[in-house]
Amino acid sequence: MMVSPAAQAALGNAYAQNGNIDKAVSCLKKAADMADSKAEDDTNNSIAPTFLLQAGELLESQNNKAEALKIYQDIKKKYVNSQLVQSYEIDKYIERVSE
């Protein structure tokens, strides 16, 4: 059965609500990968960084700054045209976990 990236992300959010952060992060990363593979014309690319950002925030909430930083840097490098990167918003996240 094929699920959509949004459904995969919703599953991740459900895990997060129940305190299962590792599983939540895994689901959100998978959702981003799924969104990327569906993005033949870059339309879905705007959603993948959002899923990754959620994963990074969850890692941050667990004080796993190193993993969060890796995700934030990946967003900045891979999704240069996303609003998150264009607005320099991602830099705030990178700066926060780099302290």
Predicted regions span which residues?
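Short solvent-exposed coil/turn linkers within tandem alpha-helical repeat scaffolds
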Residues: 1-5, 34-48, 76-89
